[in-house]
């Protein structure tokens, strides 16, 4: 693990980056608003907001589609795997960019 320094909230950047994913959109928004200095944390906060917000919208859409419940199981499994991977990568100090979402998150974290 790489020591990354402290954030404006007093936590290590890697810890705060991982916490951005803990409760999905909620912690993403919380850290995006509260963190004033760390671009690393802001990146993970925005990526969390877009990822879990998008998955939430997708699950709502699937609820209205006949047999959408079958696909929702796969979406939930993918969401769980992405949740674990993103938290782990952030904790390790990596700026792990998801396809498409990562580029958008990078723009909004500057």
Swiss-Prot record:
Membrane topology: Multi-pass membrane protein
Subcellular localization(s) per the UniProt record: Cell membrane
Transmembrane segments: 15-35, 49-69, 70-90
Pfam families in the cross-refs: DUF4870 (PF09685)
Keyword presence, Protein transport: no
InterPro entries the record matches: DUF4870
Keyword terms, alphabetized: Cell membrane, Membrane, Transmembrane, Transmembrane helix
Recorded superkingdom: Archaea
GO CC aspect terms: plasma membrane
Family classification: Belongs to the UPF0132 family.
Protein name as it appears in the record: UPF0132 membrane protein MJ1443
Organism of origin: Methanocaldococcus jannaschii (strain ATCC 43067 / DSM 2661 / JAL-1 / JCM 10045 / NBRC 100440) (Methanococcus jannaschii)
